[in-house]
């Protein structure tokens, strides 16, 4: 392969990596093109993919609020594939899930770790699911801070406060007692989909979609 051919191929791969598929919808008024995520949003499907951070959280919150305004009585489906991330960003999604009127059904595809696992279990009771080869991981919050000793102490106390609150909420959503949650989140705790169901993080493992007859 020549150098020019290699450069061209590398460029094509990079372009494909950022490509969002488009779908065409036919109607009496003609054709309309949607990117695939906007089209799925019409079906009340939201994707939470990648690290949980402020910008992504704002997009997820905005989509949930929009779908509530569209129809407050119809479920929202939140697909999660995330290694976790910011606690404050995740809590903005969590609080919105609890605040809005529609039930939020959560489905883990791939992985739901740390804050991703927390949001997975925060779905409506009976509507929290994993695909069979998904992985779920819970642990205590991570933190790091540099500065004066007093400031380090303040931030350490804040992390401990966040840890206590997350453990309380995990206990509430899973049905586990607080002591069990405290013990099981002390270190990274990986679970299979079936184990996550036994633990109470989810309600069921989906092998096949259940189609309405």
Curated annotation (Swiss-Prot):
> What is the predominant subcellular site recorded for this chain?
cytoplasm
UniProt GO BP: protein quality control for misfolded or incompletely synthesized proteins
EC number per UniProt: 3.4.21.92
Pfam families for the chain: CLP_protease
Give the residues annotated as active site.
114, 139
Subcellular localization is given as:
Cytoplasm
Catalytic activity reported:
Hydrolysis of proteins to small peptides in the presence of ATP and magnesium. alpha-casein is the usual test substrate. In the absence of ATP, only oligopeptides shorter than five residues are hydrolyzed (such as succinyl-Leu-Tyr-|-NHMec, and Leu-Tyr-Leu-|-Tyr-Trp, in which cleavage of the -Tyr-|-Leu- and -Tyr-|-Trp bonds also occurs)
UniProt GO cellular component terms: cytoplasm; endopeptidase Clp complex
Identify the keywords attached in UniProt to this record, alphabetized: Cytoplasm, Hydrolase, Protease, Serine protease
Q: Which cysteines are joined by disulfide bonds?
A: none
Q: Which GO terms describe its molecular function?
A: ATP-dependent peptidase activity; ATPase binding; serine-type endopeptidase activity
Job description of the protein: Cleaves peptides in various proteins in a process that requires ATP hydrolysis. Has a chymotrypsin-like activity. Plays a major role in the degradation of misfolded proteins.
> Which proteins does it associate with, and in what oligomeric form?
Fourteen ClpP subunits assemble into 2 heptameric rings which stack back to back to give a disk-like structure with a central cavity, resembling the structure of eukaryotic proteasomes.
Q: Which family does it belong to?
A: Belongs to the peptidase S14 family.
Q: What is this protein's record name?
A: ATP-dependent Clp protease proteolytic subunit
């Amino acid at each position: 392969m020549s150098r020019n051919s290699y450069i061209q191929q590398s460029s094509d791969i990079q372009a494909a990596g950022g490509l969002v598929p488009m779908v065409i919808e036919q109607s009496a008024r003609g054709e309309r093109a949607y990117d695939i995520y906007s089209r799925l949003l019409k079906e009340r499907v939201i994707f939470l993919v990648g690290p949980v951070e402020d910008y992504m959280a704002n997009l997820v919150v905005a989509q949930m609020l929009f779908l509530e305004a569209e129809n407050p009585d119809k479920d929202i489906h939140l697909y999660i594939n995330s290694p976790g991330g910011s606690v404050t960003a995740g809590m903005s999604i969590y609080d919105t899930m609890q605040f809005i009127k529609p039930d939020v059904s959560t489905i883990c595809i791939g992985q739901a770790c740390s804050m991703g696992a927390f949001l997975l279990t925060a779905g409506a009771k009976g509507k929290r699911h994993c695909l069979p080869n998904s992985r779920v991981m819970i642990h205590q919050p991570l933190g790091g801070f540099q500065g004066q000793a007093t400031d380090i102490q303040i931030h350490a106390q804040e992390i401990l406060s966040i840890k206590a609150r997350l453990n309380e909420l995990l206990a509430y959503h899973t049905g586990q007692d607080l002591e069990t949650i405290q013990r099981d989140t002390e270190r990274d705790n990986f679970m299979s989909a079936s184990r996550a169901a036994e633990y109470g993080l989810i309600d069921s493992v989906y092998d096949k979609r259940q189609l309405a007859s």
